[in-house]
Amino acid sequence: MNTLTFLLSTVIELYTMVLLLRIWMQWAHCDFYNPFSQFVVKVTQPIIGPLRRVIPAMGPIDSASLLVAYILSFIKAIVLFKVVTFLPIIWIAGLLILLKTIGLLIFWVLLVMAIMSWVSQGRSPIEYVLIQLADPLLRPIRRLLPAMGGIDFSPMILVLLLYVINMGVAEVLQATGNMLLPGLWMAL
């Protein structure tokens, strides 16, 4: 049963990350004709296409993709808790799972971008999209801390900021008195 839970949880998280990538790519105005962008659109289009006719976009945010990502996070919470209930704690857990997945996605994009910058040297279409994704997040840090000696420290600063936010959210959840949510947050 734990193997099935792990497998289902992983598949849900991966598809949620692809949905979040789609939202992020639209927000960052990534090159739509890039092969990686086309992959993300083709993987998500069967579910998002019909929903977009019913659910309009909220400015630069693709609300249909965000809704499906939240529903998948809610399903992941049910899978992790191994209980089918619609109590508010499960809805909150779904939101926390979605927020944690956003943080993990940012971390992985930064890590893969850094590794690819050492290996591919700008020839990969994936690297081009990752740079387009990370640039809006790194630009404010680069304004405060420009590259020193040709080394850009902004990705490391952003990863450190993600860790601080992660610990801060855990402390806030612990202060609520509910022991389930901080444990869930740290276990994800």
From Swiss-Prot:
Keywords of the record: Cell membrane, Membrane, Transmembrane, Transmembrane helix
Signal peptide: none
Example of a GO cellular component annotation carried by this entry: plasma membrane
Disulphide bridges, residue numbers: none
Record field: transmembrane: 1-21, 67-87, 89-109, 145-165, 168-188
InterPro entries: CCB3/YggT
Subcellular location: Cell membrane
Topological category with respect to the lipid bilayer: Multi-pass membrane protein
Domain of life per record: Bacteria
Matching Pfam families: YGGT
Any one biological process term the GO annotation gives: cellular hyperosmotic response
Protein family: Belongs to the YggT family.
PANTHER family listed in its UniProt record: PROTEIN COFACTOR ASSEMBLY OF COMPLEX C SUBUNIT B CCB3, CHLOROPLASTIC-RELATED, YLMG HOMOLOG PROTEIN 2, CHLOROPLASTIC
Name of the protein: Uncharacterized protein YggT
Organism field: Escherichia coli (strain K12)
Organism placement in taxonomy: Bacteria, Pseudomonadati, Pseudomonadota, Gammaproteobacteria, Enterobacterales
Gene behind this protein: yggT
